[in-house]
Amino acid sequence: MGLFLQHKTDDIQWAVWKMEESLDALLALLPDARRVFCEQDLNRFVSERRKMEWLSVRVLLYAMLQEDKEIGYSPEGKPYLTDHSFFISISHTKGYVAVMLASFTPAGIDIEQYAQRVHKVSDRYIRSDEQTEPYQGDMTWGLLLHWSAKEAVFKRMENADADLRKLRLTHFI
């Protein structure tokens, strides 16, 4: 099974799924009714990668709760559980998906793949008055953590027009 990491408290839980299974193997991990729905809904995606991400999120959600839940999307693209039992946030990066559930407050989660490209785009999300520090001596990790923190805050916000450059982070590592 692809459950890679999981953390639970009374009000919040998050988990990360490593996408290693085939689409058929993922479908087999879902309850029968959800499997039928997912098989039909997968046809709207052309990309195999996108199919894997979409289905892995649903399998991870089922693994976390052991209950069948449906994910809907607001007009802005923000995910929600159709029964409103939890606030939900979703993230994916190469080979992994993450889901965060919160009982009483909007949730925000972000995962990023370690890559040097973060240096090239840092001016798109770091303000001139913010200081990004290396994490464990590695500036790439520092930039990725900064980006991820801002993405998680952005996902938690209700304002779809928020600009990451306007969010100011203080030292958080």
Predicted regions mapped to residue ranges:
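Core catalytic alpha/beta fold that binds nucleotide/phospho-ligands
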Residues: 1-173
